Amino acid sequence: MNTKTTNFTFAFDKKNLNLAETIIKKYPPNGKRSAILPLLDLAQRQNGGWLHISAIEYVANMLEMPYMRAYEVATFYSMFNLSPVGKYHIQVCTTTPCWLRGSDDIMKICEKKLAIKHKETTKDQKFTLSEIECLGACVNAPVVQINDDYYEDLNEAKMEKLIEQYLNDL
């Protein structure tokens, strides 16, 4: 889906609007822009795991900041997805420690088992496969993040088993 041409208007639902207002109150009145990360995350979670352009604009307006500043934040951090992702977003860390411990093999297993490549989503919208920069768990490399869960000390067999579990919806 092209996020620039889709007619879609984002707004927090009542529950998330209350949560957003609570988050904003944690910051001083002149520093509410600092709530940008948690509010973008909240918007992404409400929107099925990705940020539509209108969600970024909505958050920017809520924080009384220029849209471009919010967009810069959303595009800088790899935790934000600017296009739809599958139900299970598999992110393989490929930075040096993980690469040295076999992240290339982990990526190949994912591609083979799911029949997709990096930055693709399965036809049933169940899986999206991505590379991600350091997840901060280098001591337990290689590491994969699936949605909010980390899986560490992986090898090909462990990754195959993990994918099977997700194929069966755990």
From Swiss-Prot:
Keyword match Iron? yes
Tell me which SUPFAM superfamilies the record gives. Thioredoxin-like (SSF52833)
Q: Does the keyword Magnesium apply?
A: no
- Which cofactor does this sequence's record say it needs? [2Fe-2S] cluster
Q: Tell me which residues bind [2Fe-2S] cluster.
A: 93, 98, 134, 138
Note on cofactor: Binds 1 [2Fe-2S] cluster.
List the Gene Ontology MF annotations in alphabetical order. 2 iron, 2 sulfur cluster binding; metal ion binding; NADH dehydrogenase activity; quinone binding
What does the record give as the reaction this protein catalyses?
Answer: a quinone + NADH + 5 H(+)(in) = a quinol + NAD(+) + 4 H(+)(out)
- What Pfam families does this protein's entry cite? 2Fe-2S_thioredx (PF01257)
Going by the record, the broad EC class of this enzyme is: translocase
Q: Which CDD domains match?
A: TRX_Fd_NuoE (cd03064)
**PROSITE patterns from the xrefs?**
COMPLEX1_24K
The UniProt keyword set, sorted, is: 2Fe-2S, Iron, Iron-sulfur, Metal-binding, NAD, Quinone, Translocase
Name the EC number(s). 7.1.1.-
- InterPro entries with a match to the protein in the record: NuoE-like, NuoE_dom, NuoE_N, Thioredoxin-like_sf
The role this protein plays is: NDH-1 shuttles electrons from NADH, via FMN and iron-sulfur (Fe-S) centers, to quinones in the respiratory chain. Couples the redox reaction to proton translocation (for every two electrons transferred, four hydrogen ions are translocated across the cytoplasmic membrane), and thus conserves the redox energy in a proton gradient.
Report the family membership: Belongs to the complex I 24 kDa subunit family.
Q: What is this protein called?
A: NADH-quinone oxidoreductase subunit E
Provide the species name.
Answer: Rickettsia typhi (strain ATCC VR-144 / Wilmington)
Q: Recite the lineage of the species.
A: Bacteria, Pseudomonadati, Pseudomonadota, Alphaproteobacteria, Rickettsiales
* Gene expressing this chain: nuoE
